[in-house]
Amino acid sequence: MTGVQTCALPIYIYETDRQKSGTTLICVYIYRNGMYWASVGDSAIFLFRQGRLYQLNKEHNRLNELYLKFMYREITKEQLMAEPSLQGLTSNIGRRELRDLDQNLTGLRLQSGDRILLCTDGVSGRLTEKELLVAMSQGTAQACADVMKSMVLKKNAPKQDNLTAEVICCD
């Protein structure tokens, strides 16, 4: 049983006594200039390197699942666009079994100047890549997070239910 599965079981037991819900999980472990990660749900892990932004993990939502079906010609574009809940999670902590777990066990070699962004969909789903690049270009980790927060709140989105960003600067 993995560590992620171990923490998922108590959440599942707790939630079944109430209503069906769950949570996403993103975590990174940095050891000897290597970064390892695990993720469940639609929160995102980004690498900001030399002015470019790379998403490292796969988000577990209905849109990505249906997009793959579209790419393999299992559904039409019309069927994809007709789906009512494209942002619905396909995996999260709080289900009896984890359907999807994205992880890197080989380690990504980090370089001096790299920045890592861990964020909820309240950030990655609201800000464009260009906005994320502007935010991640700020002087300090705190400044990056503050700019993201300001950008998200300025949009005044009606269904904004979360806003979490953690920035790690690698020296």
Question: Which residues does each predicted region cover?
Answer:
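PP2C/PPM-type serine/threonine phosphatase catalytic domain
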Residues: 4-171
